[in-house]
Amino acid sequence: GGAEATANSPVVQSLNVSTTTVLRCRTYADGSYPSEEIIRTYVFEQQPSLAAVFVTTDPLSMFSADSGLYMTGNSASMMDPKYGANFWSNRELPVYVEMFEPGSPKTPAFGVMGDFKISGQYSRAKEKKSFSVTLREEYGNKRLKYPLFPDYPELKKFKAFSLRNFGNNSGDDYVRDRIGTQMTEGLGVDYQHGRYVIVYYNGKYYGIHDLRERNSEYYYETRYGLDPNDIDLLD
């Protein structure tokens, strides 16, 4: 699943769905423009105690062995972190992102189009990778208007957000990264709010990730209402 609906896609009148499935649908008629594409994820999983994030995108663009953004590709070095691999590219992919909250498993809390980009440093070579999603006006949504972090309902407008693989600790623990961040709460310094979520790509389970505020000029828009064009970030 995940491939964009085109005029060459299979035509269906009705469809029975019994496993977790992503559907991308569009109507075509002679002499008319194609309809807007509708993307929906149908979930047949045991209700988790964590929120679930479903990422839908063209499967070849993401997972093709040769050119997929998530994959090693043909130009990577042998040693980690495999410089030259596809996942070191700055390329972005259009994705559709849905989020299901634990208490409302039947209806997504939101569904938005955005640009997907692999992030991180050495942990890019891990099987599970960190990534960011950035909303674009060209997709119809300049901002995500939803409180991503239930403990902080005042934060409800986001240009971008990150889903981390827990960095170099990925696969070893899921605690250190979050605790290290949360310990700064109350110290009067800025830090990224976060929460644990599970992630699916095109309906396939990809494990627990750390949903975070994106560390960029838009962080200050969300937190303080500042114009991101007035922010200069220095590394």
Set out the residue ranges of the language-model regions:
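Conserved ATP-binding subdomain of kinase catalytic cores across diverse folds
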Residues: 55, 76-235
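Short, compositionally stereotyped local motifs that mark structural "simplifiers"
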Residues: 1-115, 137
